[in-house]
Every structure is written in structure tokens, then in C-alpha cells.
A protein has these predicted regions:
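Residues that define the transmembrane beta-barrel architecture of outer-membrane proteins
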Residues: 94-96, 255, 290-294
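Amphipathic alpha-helical coiled-coil segments
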Residues: 46-61, 133, 137-156, 174, ...
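Bacterial Sec-pathway N-terminal export signals of envelope proteins
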Residues: 22-68, 180-183, 218-260, 343, ...
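Bacterial N-terminal signal peptides that target proteins for export
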Residues: 1-11
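Small/polar (Gly/Ser/Thr/Ala-rich) solvent-exposed segments
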Residues: 45, 68-89, 103-132, 268-294, ...
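Acidic, low-complexity, intrinsically disordered peripheral segments
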Residues: 23, 31-32, 397-416
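Periplasmic alpha-helical coiled-coil/stalk elements that build and connect Gram-negative outer-membrane
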Residues: 134-248, 345, 349, 391
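Bacterial N-terminal signal peptides
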Residues: 9-19
Length: 416
């Protein structure tokens, strides 16, 4: 009994569609997807736009300390209705004015310096947010790439295992015809081939699904079949928590709280400005040519009492500082714990992979011996199938362990 021709035709088409030679021009590596993800991310574009917009605020602050020139104009004509109308002592009979005023804040070096410092710190915070967003995006893309690559490894293994079973089919058929093996042994092989065909198809479906997920994450509109190259993720050996982006954020937050306190102090600092104006200010239109003039002077403002709002603002900043310290201390403890966890998992996974390789090597030698002995009719064919099943389990464990190792390396590399 043989497999139906339609099944083998379908198998041939499937294997051809997955042929590495056919897809040699469609190989892609991790860098391709990382670059595409960074270029297409609307979140990164938005963060970069916010950073550029905040840089413009420094120019706005600088302009605010330069002379401010304004112009005002007013024409007021109160009609005389006999016994009714506004009192002329109040309205002066009308108002006709047009004045240009220039005002300059004096002794503004300190306020300007503090505001520039605050904007600089905000720029640093935004730049750090961009860096953290890039790290998160790269980590997510790499994790999905590893998942898809693991699926591809599973496809390759299932194809190779299918070839092993198919290679035994002609020899076993001849041995069955010669009475060395039973017809049930041949049927058992065919069932194993059918099972492996289904496993291969499921692996292909899973690979394509995870490849689509990778394209979605990177903003790539592409339906073509590609071969993913093995990701090269270096083993990060140096970890300095003080240089981590998250710890830098805590430091910037501390400096911003200090700058906020200085801004509060500036609000209560006396302010002095000089002004000058020129124009026309008349109550009678006929006197406008004679009412052209100018004036100048000083403006002084100082807060005397505001209900102790300054102290309340100080208390609010103090609460924010305490909260910042709590988050920083928790992050520091969490960082070290996470680092130890990942390093322990990596060591354990490396040991597991080494053990699985030894097991697979032994199973491969046994499988080769079975092939020779089957050809001579020296072993039960069911024992060969059991060995193939055991070999399959070990290879699946190896694929999963290697996937876990790559994921751990990804976690370590982008630990923040």
C-alpha cells in the first residue's frame, strides 16, 4: 500500500515553496527589520517632533526677555443728548489715542538662566524618552524575529525528518514484498509520513503567521515568503546601573524638581522694568496735532503676601521628590534581581542545550544503525519508529531551548 499520488504532489509543491535555493534572493536579517521598525514607527516620530518643538521654546523664552513693543489705539465719542448722556467730567468729551509702547525687563539674567536650564532639562528628558522608546521597540522586534526564526528552524527540522522517513519507504516496501517485514510495518511508516506532513504544514502556517506579526510590528507591507537568517545577539557582559537610561531619567527628574523650586523663588522675586511710549492722546479731534507726545518710566512689582502659597508649592515639590526616590530605590532593586535571574537562566539554558546535543548525537548514531539493520531485516520496524519519535522530541526540545537562549540574550542586551 502506497501513499496517494495527490499527497506526494502536494508535498513536492510544499517542499519546493520552502526551498532555500528558491528563496536565496529573499533572505533577510535582524538589522533589516530593526531599521524598518525605527523608520516607520509613528511613536518615535511623535517623540522626535516633541523634542524639536521644545527646542523652539528656548527661542521663545529668549524673545520674551527682549524689548516688547506694542501699539494701542482708541477712539471714544460720547454723544450729547441734551438732558441725557455721560458726565463730561468723566468722559472729557471723548478720547482719541494711538500709542506705541516699548517695555524692557531689567536685571533679567537670573530668570533667563533658570528658564533656559528648565528647558534644557526638558529637552534631555525628551531625548531620553526617545532612547527608551527605541530600546523598547528594538527589544519587541528582536523578540518577534526570534520567534519567527524558531518557527523556521522547526520547519527545516520537520522537512529533514520527513525526508528520513521517505528515504526508508522504497527499501521497506521491497522488504515487505520479500516477507522480511509485515504489511503493517509499511502501513505504520505511511502513517508516520502522513503525520509528519501535517506537522510540516502546521509549522509552515505558524512561521507565516509569526512572519506577518513581525511585518506588522515593523510597519512593513509585504506578503512575500522570506528566509530569516539566524539573529546575531551579542552577550552583554558589563552592566552598570548608574549608566542605564532609566537611572538617567531619575537624575534628570531630580534636576527638574530643583529647577522648579528656583522658578517658584523667581515668582516671588521683585521685578523691575522700564517703559517708554510715544503717540497721540487727545480729547478733542481738533487738538490732535498739538497732543502728540511721549512718556517714560519704571514699573516695579513685588509679592508681599499670598496666603503662604510659596510654602505649599515647596511641600508639593517635596512630595514629588520623595516619590521619585521611592521609584529609584525600587528600580535599583528590581534591576539587580532581574539581572541575576537572566544570568542564571542563561547558564542553565546553556547547560540544557549541551545535554540535548549529546542526547541527539547518541540518537543520531542509533538512527543510523537502525537504517543499516532495517535494510538487513535485523530489527523490529516499530523500534525504528520509536527511535524516530524520541529523536523528534529531542530536536523539538533543542529548538525550544535555543529559542529561549536567544530570548534571554535579547532581554540582557536591552536590559534598562
Amino acid at each position: 500500500m502506497v501513499c496517494r499520488p495527490a499527497i506526494f504532489a502536494w508535498l513536492s509543491c510544499l517542499l519546493l515553496s520552502l526551498s532555500p535555493e528558491l528563496l536565496a534572493q529573499q533572505q533577510r536579517n535582524l538589522d533589516y527589520y530593526l531599521n524598518a521598525g525605527l523608520a516607520n514607527s509613528p511613536m518615535l516620530f511623535d517623540s522626535t517632533s516633541q523634542f524639536k518643538a521644545n527646542q523652539l521654546d528656548s527661542l521663545k523664552v529668549l524673545a520674551g526677555f527682549r524689548p516688547q513693543v506694542t501699539s494701542t489705539g482708541n477712539i471714544t465719542v460720547p454723544p450729547d443728548l441734551g438732558k441725557f448722556g455721560y458726565d463730561s467730567a468723566i468722559t472729557n468729551g471723548g478720547n482719541y489715542s494711538g500709542v506705541v509702547t516699548a517695555e524692557q525687563q531689567l536685571f533679567s539674567n537670573r530668570p533667563r538662566k533658570v528658564q533656559f536650564q528648565n528647558i534644557t532639562l526638558l529637552n534631555q528628558a525628551l531625548r531620553l524618552n526617545i532612547q527608551l522608546s527605541e530600546i523598547d521597540l528594538k527589544k519587541s522586534i528582536t523578540a518577534q524575529y526570534i520567534t519567527a526564526y524558531s518557527d523556521l528552524s522547526q520547519v527545516e527540522f520537520n522537512r529533514n525528518l520527513l525526508k528520513i522517513l521517505q528515504d526508508e519507504q522504497p527499501a521497506l516496501k521491497k522488504l515487505v514484498e520479500n516477507g522480511v517485514y509485515l504489511q503493517t510495518d509499511y502501513l505504520n511508516l505511511n502513517v508516520s509520513i502522513q503525520t509528519q506532513l501535517i506537522a510540516l504544514k502546521k509549522a509552515v502556517i505558524q512561521y507565516r503567521d509569526d512572519l506577518y506579526a513581525l511585518n506588522l510590528l515593523c510597519g512593513i507591507n509585504d506578503r512575500s515568503e522570506v528566509i530569516l537568517l539566524k539573529p546575531e545577539i551579542p552577550l552583554r557582559s558589563a552592566f552598570f546601573i548608574q549608566n542605564s537610561p532609566q537611572m538617567q531619567r531619575f537624575r534628570i527628574d531630580s534636576l527638574r524638581l530643583r529647577a522648579s523650586r528656583e522658578l517658584i523663588d523667581l515668582h516671588y522675586r521683585p521685578r523691575l522694568s522700564a517703559f517708554a511710549d510715544a503717540g497721540v492722546n487727545a480729547i478733542n479731534p481738533r487738538n490732535i496735532p498739538h497732543n502728540i507726545g511721549t512718556s517714560f518710566g519704571l514699573n516695579f512689582t513685588a509679592v508681599i503676601y499670598d496666603g503662604r502659597q510659596r510654602r505649599l508649592e515647596y511641600n508639593r515639590l517635596m512630595l514629588r521628590e520623595i516619590t521619585r526616590q521611592k521609584y529609584r530605590d525600587f528600580y535599583s532593586s528590581q534591576y539587580q534581581t532581574r539581572l541575576y535571574q537572566l544570568q542564571d537562566r542563561l547558564n542553565a539554558t546553556d547547560e540544557l542545550i549541551a545535554e540535548i546535543h549529546e542526547q541527539i548525537a547518541a540518537q543520531q548514531r542509533l538512527l543510523d544503525m537502525y537504517k543499516v539493520e532495517i535494510a538487513n531485516g535485523l530489527v523490529r520496524f516499530t523500534d525504528f519508529i520509536l527511535n524516530v519519535t524520541s529523536y523528534t522530541t529531542s530536536r523539538n526540545s533543542l529548538v525550544q531551548a535555543e529559542n529561549d537562549r536567544l530570548q534571554i540574550l535579547n532581554e540582557l542586551y536591552y536590559l534598562k
